[in-house]
C-alpha cells in the first residue's frame, strides 16, 4: 500500500482546479463529499482528471491516478517545484501573441515533437487554458489535436497552482488504469470513480479516454470490478456517471443519488442544458 505523507487539510472555500476539464466535478464536490463514508483516511481516484474532488475533500492521504501520462507528469512537477514551474510558465502565457492561432498551433507542434517532461508540462497547461473549452484529446498518432479556443481573455491560474502544490504533498500521483489503481485499496480507503461519461443515447458508443476508447464494455468492466472489490474489501466505492437506463443496469445493487448538472462543454451554446447524473454508491456509509 502506498503511503504518501500525511497531511490534514480543511478547505474553508471551494478550490478550483488549475486545469479546465471536460466533465470536471467542481460543481458536485459538496454532493460527493456528503456521500463519502466517515472515518476513512485515504481517498483513491482512478480517474483523477483535473482533481476537483481531491482539492475539495478532507482525507489524510490520496492515491490519484489517470492513464494520461501528460496529466500525471504535470501534477508531479507542480507538486515537486511549483515556484520554478510558475516562473517558467509565465513567458509563454504572457507573450504578446499568446492568444493567437499562429502562436497556439506553433506551441501545439512543439508539444507534439517534445520528449522532455518539463517542457511538455508547461506547454500542456498553455494548451489547456488557450485551447477549445479545456478539452484534452489526442489523435491515433498520440498527438494532441485540440483546436485553438479563440477566447477574448485568459487567466493564469497561479493561486490555483500553489494550492494544488500545497495539497499535493499528501498525495501520490500514478499513471495507470483503473484496474491497477483498485489494487491499492485497503480497509482505510474509499474509492471515487469519475470515468468518461456513458453515452446519453445508446447509439453514441464512444467516449474519449486520453486517446483511447472507453466504451460500454469498459463501463461495464468498471462496474463489475467495483462490485467485486467492495465485497472483497468491505469498503465504499462511488461512481459518477450519466443517469441512464444503461448505467442503472450496470450499477445494479448500488444506492443511487441523483443530481442535475449544467453541461459546460458544447460547440453549440444552445445545447448547454442541465443533464441528469447519478452517483452510484457501493457499500454502506460507515
Curated annotation (Swiss-Prot):
**Protein name, please?**
DNA adenine methylase
The family classification in the record reads: Belongs to the N(4)/N(6)-methyltransferase family.
Q: Does the keyword Zinc apply?
A: no
NCBIfam families according to UniProt: dam
Biological processes per GO annotation: DNA replication; DNA restriction-modification system; methylation; mismatch repair
What are the binding positions for S-adenosyl-L-methionine in this chain? 21, 25, 66, 194
Q: Which UniProt keywords apply?
A: DNA replication, DNA-binding, Methyltransferase, S-adenosyl-L-methionine, Transferase
* Taxonomic source organism: Haemophilus influenzae (strain ATCC 51907 / DSM 11121 / KW20 / Rd)
Quote the InterPro entries the UniProt record gives: Ade_MeTrfase_dom_2, DNA_methylase_N6_adenine_CS, M_m6A_EcoRV, MeTrfase_D12, SAM-dependent_MTases_sf
State the Gene Ontology terms under molecular function. S-adenosyl-L-methionine binding; sequence-specific DNA binding; site-specific DNA-methyltransferase (adenine-specific) activity
Superkingdom to which the source organism belongs: Bacteria
What task does this protein carry out?
May be involved in methyl-directed DNA mismatch repair, initiation of chromosome replication and gene expression.
